[in-house]
Regions:
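Primarily recognizes Gram-negative and organellar outer-membrane beta-barrels
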Residues: 74-77, 105
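Bacterial Sec-dependent N-terminal signal peptides
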Residues: 1-30
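Terminal processing/anchoring signals of secreted or surface-associated proteins
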Residues: 1, 22-24, 53, 120, ...
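Short linear capping/connector segments at secondary-structure termini
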Residues: 32-35, 97-99, 166-174
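Membrane-proximal, proline-rich intrinsically disordered regions
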Residues: 22-74, 99
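Conserved, well-structured interaction surfaces
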Residues: 47, 55-59, 84-159, 173-176
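Short, compositionally biased low-complexity segments
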Residues: 22-29, 89-93, 162
Length: 177
């Protein structure tokens, strides 16, 4: 009986504390906030921004099996390999030249390159506004523009004419996407 009363009191106290919270949000003033431009005006951080663009090339949808399938298996430079019952997602279609635009390898290559282009456009947006050493700034901008050209080269090589995006876009703007 005593445990039941204690348990009931515990439940009532818990409900009281949970239901009697503040109604207003806690507003905290940022004292040491660093803007993105302050952060990037440090040369080491600007280099890290460009390294983030290079890093995109390590993603699975850049130069992995989807890319090999589109460039080597379809041209007979390579075979799907394995056993006939192992489809390798859509690689058996590429090996037989019966693939379609909705196959996963095509969307991987397409999405991977445009994700890289998105990164390059964001990097260029910030790099062009920085106040770092002009030689370093020009080098970083040239590296990022090269990577964007490489991504477009891959897209044109696989798909022909593609939409060209050369400025930073707001991914929340549904009209652009």
């Amino acid at each position: 009986m005593k445990t039941r009363i204690n348990f009931s009191l515990f439940i009532i106290a818990t409900c009281f504390f949970l239901l009697s919270s503040c109604e207003d949000d806690l507003d905290v003033e940022l004292r040491d906030a660093v803007t993105e431009f302050d952060f990037l005006n440090n040369p080491d951080n600007a280099i890290q921004l460009v390294n983030g663009v290079y890093n995109k090339q390590l993603d699975y949808n850049m130069y992995s099996f989807s890319w090999i399938g589109m460039t080597s298996i379809t041209s007979d430079d390579a075979d799907k390999g394995s056993t006939p019952s192992d489809t390798g997602s859509d690689k058996h279609k590429m090996d037989n030249l019966t693939f379609g635009a909705s196959d996963i390898s095509f969307s991987d290559v397409w999405n991977g390159r445009y994700e890289g282009i998105y990164r390059t456009n964001n990097a260029l947006f910030y790099l062009e506004q920085l106040t770092i050493d002009s030689a370093l700034k020009n080098r970083l901008i040239a590296e990022v523009k090269f990577l964007r050209a490489l991504f477009y080269f891959d897209l044109v090589r696989c798909f022909g004419g593609v939409p060209v995006v050369t400025s930073k876009i707001d991914i929340n703007n549904t009209e652009l996407i």
